[in-house]
Amino acid sequence: MPRSFLVKKIKGDGFQCSGVPAPTYHPLETAYVLPGARGPPGDNGYAPHRLPPSSYDADQKPGLELAPAEPAYPPAAPEEYSDPESPQSSLSARYFRGEAAVTDSYSMDAFFISDGRSRRRRGGGGGDAGGSGDAGGAGGRAGRAGAQAGGGHRHACAECGKTYATSSNLSRHKQTHRSLDSQLARKCPTCGKAYVSMPALAMHLLTHNLRHKCGVCGKAFSRPWLLQGHMRSHTGEKPFGCAHCGKAFADRSNLRAHMQTHSAFKHYRCRQCDKSFALKSYLHKHCEAACAKAAEPPPPTPAGPAS
């Protein structure tokens, strides 16, 4: 899983106002959550279980000052891993010391805020699937901010019609239209595989340098977070929990896909049974399993012995 998809935690302000019920704070939410609070569905199809900032800012006591926000992760030395998904993270260390498991709750709003690939906001120029996936989280946020500042202008590809928020994302996409016979195509010096996209070639080169090895089974990986995900198969750790139903996952990408099942927007519909799904992959699985079996004719009944 690319480093750009890591969702950083946001530390809340530890102050409480009179007249307002004590709120709870989710690690990745940017607003306080009231127990049992309900409201109409938001723009992303979820109920906004949050207390608006205006309701507690008005009752702030005179002379009360908020402590300055501290960084969510302390600075680490160059040889240390500050990445929470690294194999040397404190979370993995607690597992190997036999301490209790910790699962953080994540809501879909956290992915809309921090995930560069997140898209589909109602009335807001729904981007395509590959619009900012290569650019990463920071690039995705910058691209969306630039699109809003520029009146929603999108950069369109002249060959396939796909649109992108930034010209750099469009330029990166145009590389995929190159021919393998083009002079701009490059080959891997190790295995000779040809690529027309330079970011794809860069990711491929990492597969020939498997520096991160599992201390349990010896399997090697090109990236520390890939090793971290593999280590969870040994520890049983599931640190990514759904804030809506409580189901936990070992990998953030699996949680992101699961979040779509809670969405009110299900765009993919089966043509045979009219059932709708939030993800195209779920529709494919449904068509291959349930509908495909229902459409098959029953096997012929074997004829009995002739009398």
Curated annotation (Swiss-Prot):
<comment type="similarity">
    <text>Belongs to the snail C2H2-type zinc-finger protein family.</text>
</comment>
<dbReference type="GO" id="GO:0000785">
    <property type="term" value="C:chromatin"/>
</dbReference>
<feature type="zinc finger region" description="C2H2-type 4">
    <location>
        <begin position="240"/>
        <end position="262"/>
    </location>
</feature>
<dbReference type="InterPro" id="IPR036236">
    <property type="entry name" value="Znf_C2H2_sf"/>
</dbReference>
<dbReference type="GO" id="GO:0070888">
    <property type="term" value="F:E-box binding"/>
</dbReference>
<protein>
    <recommendedName>
        <fullName>Transcriptional repressor scratch 2</fullName>
    </recommendedName>
</protein>
<keyword id="KW-0677">Repeat</keyword>
<keyword id="KW-0863">Zinc-finger</keyword>
<dbReference type="InterPro" id="IPR013087">
    <property type="entry name" value="Znf_C2H2_type"/>
</dbReference>
<feature type="zinc finger region" description="C2H2-type 1">
    <location>
        <begin position="155"/>
        <end position="177"/>
    </location>
</feature>
<feature type="region of interest" description="Disordered">
    <location>
        <begin position="34"/>
        <end position="90"/>
    </location>
</feature>
<feature type="zinc finger region" description="C2H2-type 3">
    <location>
        <begin position="212"/>
        <end position="234"/>
    </location>
</feature>
<feature type="zinc finger region" description="C2H2-type 5; atypical">
    <location>
        <begin position="268"/>
        <end position="291"/>
    </location>
</feature>
<keyword id="KW-0805">Transcription regulation</keyword>
<dbReference type="GO" id="GO:0005634">
    <property type="term" value="C:nucleus"/>
</dbReference>
<dbReference type="GO" id="GO:0008270">
    <property type="term" value="F:zinc ion binding"/>
</dbReference>
<dbReference type="GO" id="GO:1902042">
    <property type="term" value="P:negative regulation of extrinsic apoptotic signaling pathway via death domain receptors"/>
</dbReference>
<dbReference type="GO" id="GO:0000978">
    <property type="term" value="F:RNA polymerase II cis-regulatory region sequence-specific DNA binding"/>
</dbReference>
<dbReference type="Pfam" id="PF00096">
    <property type="entry name" value="zf-C2H2"/>
</dbReference>
<comment type="function">
    <text>May be involved in transcriptional regulation.</text>
</comment>
<dbReference type="GO" id="GO:0000981">
    <property type="term" value="F:DNA-binding transcription factor activity, RNA polymerase II-specific"/>
</dbReference>
<dbReference type="GO" id="GO:0006355">
    <property type="term" value="P:regulation of DNA-templated transcription"/>
</dbReference>
<feature type="region of interest" description="SNAG domain">
    <location>
        <begin position="1"/>
        <end position="20"/>
    </location>
</feature>
<dbReference type="GO" id="GO:1990837">
    <property type="term" value="F:sequence-specific double-stranded DNA binding"/>
</dbReference>
<feature type="region of interest" description="Disordered">
    <location>
        <begin position="116"/>
        <end position="148"/>
    </location>
</feature>
<feature type="compositionally biased region" description="Gly residues">
    <location>
        <begin position="124"/>
        <end position="148"/>
    </location>
</feature>
<keyword id="KW-0862">Zinc</keyword>
<keyword id="KW-0539">Nucleus</keyword>
<dbReference type="GO" id="GO:2001222">
    <property type="term" value="P:regulation of neuron migration"/>
</dbReference>
<dbReference type="GO" id="GO:0001227">
    <property type="term" value="F:DNA-binding transcription repressor activity, RNA polymerase II-specific"/>
</dbReference>
<dbReference type="GO" id="GO:0000122">
    <property type="term" value="P:negative regulation of transcription by RNA polymerase II"/>
</dbReference>
<keyword id="KW-0238">DNA-binding</keyword>
<keyword id="KW-0479">Metal-binding</keyword>
<feature type="zinc finger region" description="C2H2-type 2">
    <location>
        <begin position="186"/>
        <end position="208"/>
    </location>
</feature>
<keyword id="KW-0804">Transcription</keyword>
<dbReference type="InterPro" id="IPR050527">
    <property type="entry name" value="Snail/Krueppel_Znf"/>
</dbReference>
